[in-house]
């Protein structure tokens, strides 16, 4: 919204700063961060008042969770979503289709998560919205986003899958492009949701991945950068950098209260929204495969559940002591803080590898 102040600028005054994506990204970051700091505690108090028992804790999970996490309120993702949405609307250009695409996916998946969290805390049970209904809604939203991306992408990128590292390599997905987008976005949302099981475990890798994808979005949205890096130019995606900066600011504001011992959990409201956002950004920037690298922690968490369920159905035995895999490490005797920080370190390493794909050709 503030971008429109440039219309009254003569090019030499302070309003001219709003032309620059980097300036507005910084503004979005600090707006979301300050919002989180100011409204975090009041929101937690409200959630604690409204949620009699807090987030239901799995009885078959690690025993320590029943002692340390019982009664902690959930739906803290509302803080991230509110900060993120406000900052994005305030600092991003409203005439940019990619911003609206990513924001649509984020808020829509947040609503699915809110419905799920609401049923859980109301019933004091893990039985929220049924898995099939949740997946159906998620795939529906992702399908709309895929169609939107198809309309926004310029030729010859529309409907194509870009391969990282390989120069000028595109795979024409044709009618499979929208189903592919559905898998990427819905898969990302649910993978982050599975990762959100320990204090601070999901939010930091999400912020690292968002920051990485934000840099990629900024780079592929500039013709000079894409010419130098020899990557595909996707005009308009640079504005996504404002969104990812707001996400990081809101995420840090949330982490202030989610740091161990957590005063609030993000819940499905936050994890589905943030995961969906990562998937949507990857689709918008034509870096879906890079998301698999940058979001490697989420991929491993999701695969651990898939492998565990499939193997147990076939043999009646388990591959892991417990899935998702972070619970396996808990059962092995790792401290919660060890798991969280080590996963953060791995996320940072994967982010650097993901950024390297911009240059390696």
From Swiss-Prot:
CDD domains: GT_MraY
GO terms under cellular component: plasma membrane
GO BP, one annotated term: peptidoglycan biosynthetic process
Keywords for this protein: Cell cycle, Cell division, Cell inner membrane, Cell membrane, Cell shape, Cell wall biogenesis/degradation, Magnesium, Membrane, Metal-binding, Peptidoglycan synthesis, Transferase, Transmembrane, Transmembrane helix
Short name of any one Pfam family annotated for the protein: MraY_sig1
Reactions the enzyme catalyzes: UDP-N-acetyl-alpha-D-muramoyl-L-alanyl-gamma-D-glutamyl-meso-2,6-diaminopimeloyl-D-alanyl-D-alanine + di-trans,octa-cis-undecaprenyl phosphate = di-trans,octa-cis-undecaprenyl diphospho-N-acetyl-alpha-D-muramoyl-L-alanyl-D-glutamyl-meso-2,6-diaminopimeloyl-D-alanyl-D-alanine + UMP
Main localization (coarse): membrane
UniProt EC number: 2.7.8.13
Keyword flag Transferase: yes
Pathway, per record: Cell wall biogenesis; peptidoglycan biosynthesis
UniProt cross-references to InterPro entries, sorted A to Z: Glycosyl_transferase_4 (IPR000715), PNAcMuramoyl-5peptid_Trfase (IPR003524), PNAcMuramoyl-5peptid_Trfase_CS (IPR018480)
One GO molecular-function entry: metal ion binding
Statement: the UniProt record of this protein carries the keyword Lyase: no
Membrane-topology descriptor: Multi-pass membrane protein
Family designation: Belongs to the glycosyltransferase 4 family. MraY subfamily.
Classification via PANTHER family: PHOSPHO-N-ACETYLMURAMOYL-PENTAPEPTIDE-TRANSFERASE, PHOSPHO-N-ACETYLMURAMOYL-PENTAPEPTIDE-TRANSFERASE HOMOLOG
HAMAP family from the UniProt entry: MraY
Protein function: Catalyzes the initial step of the lipid cycle reactions in the biosynthesis of the cell wall peptidoglycan: transfers peptidoglycan precursor phospho-MurNAc-pentapeptide from UDP-MurNAc-pentapeptide onto the lipid carrier undecaprenyl phosphate, yielding undecaprenyl-pyrophosphoryl-MurNAc-pentapeptide, known as lipid I.
Protein name, as recorded: Phospho-N-acetylmuramoyl-pentapeptide-transferase
